[in-house]
Amino acid sequence: MTLRDYWLNPRKYMEITRLAVPLLLSNAGLVFMQFADAMFLAKYSPDAIAASGMGGMVSWMVSSLFVGIVGYTSVITANNIGAHQEDKVGCVNWQGIYLALLAGVLTVLLGFLTAPFFRLVGHAPEIQALESEYLRVLLFGNVVFFVQASLGGYFSGRGDNVRLMAAQMSGQALNVVLDYALIFGKWGLPEMGVTGAALATVLSGLLPIAIMLAYFLRCDARERYHTHHWRLHWGIMARLLRFGVASGIQMWIDAALWTLFLVIIGRLGTVELAATSIAFRLNSLAFMPIIGLARGMGTLAGQRHGAREFQEVVAYICHCLVMSEIWMISIAATYALLPEWYFRMFSADGSRGTVDFAEVLATGKTLLRFVAVYCLGDACNIALSIGLHSVGDTRWTSIMMSIVTLILVAVLLYAGYAHWGLYPIWTAATVFILALPPIWIFRLRQGNWKAIRVATD
């Protein structure tokens, strides 16, 4: 293949775009949903947005391992399609559903431990109570998101992203409506604050499941993909666990790292925690579209890997990398130039809470410039790591992520012990993100992933 084939092939840009556009729209809906959630909570009180940022991050830390496992159904499905084993697709996704239900039971049990956990974290008492309530509701309802991740693999692995988009965006729209009603107590419903925000997230997740199941169990799906094969298949279950556990561990490591980051920031004060929580929400505006692009690319790379067309795999990853950086450079420029405009969208109404939003704004403007710098490296991380995951190279990436993360964890723990300020801690996190892309590039060029077989036997 020529250099043009790897980087400048219009057909590949079009293929990635065709699969990515529905995912981009779905992720745009998710970003809008998260923005609406954050703005409603910020207007309710700065304490509420601070608590939801920490509670949401801990929820993601707990659930990310299981989402990584059950969500790997998409990669196995894509590889099966490429290897012409369509009759195994339904069974793969049923194994993911069973694992999702089991994981849901485990997170319900963890939901009873939220209060002692946040006492251990040591945030301000009024923040602890809100964090505990928010996290408890999310953990009780996490099974909804696990089942969504497994069923979503059936659609994304086959490249059927339009139906996946329709299901996900319906839930996102419902979430915004329920958020408004349950946070502020509208339309005869009780005013529930952060608890209402968490409850809205869980309840709205049921609608996409219903829509996806309707398509999953249709007659044409049963005939072509054997989606009626619902029995346990230990061989396929073992393959899902073999690749999915490593993928889930990497996701968990990432979530645990940023949870620790928020814990340490929270000990600096509520202003710092609220500003960081809002900066993270704004960061999602940058990376969510990249995830959509990378997932579209991952489907194509997985299918080509299943067909053993390895040069095509690399070409799709390279084209996705170009598209990702173009977007990130554009959004980073607005973060650097217009930080106050972004933060003012989260200005609070009324006198609820314990901090003045003006203090949050002053701190947040600087934090958003950190985001503008590190999101350029984050684009590479997302495109390259999803590319490696799509070809089954989950164990190596998980090990390397663990090693690099331990270094940052040591720095963060020392920062907490030595009472570093907010900006030195953010500087350490930025350096960490920018250090990862060379690692993924090395692994891609090394080529060991070519010997991995992901498709079921």
Label each residue range with its predicted role.
Residues M1-A20, T77-V143, L189-V245, A301-V373, ...:
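Short alpha-helical transmembrane segments in multi-pass integral membrane proteins
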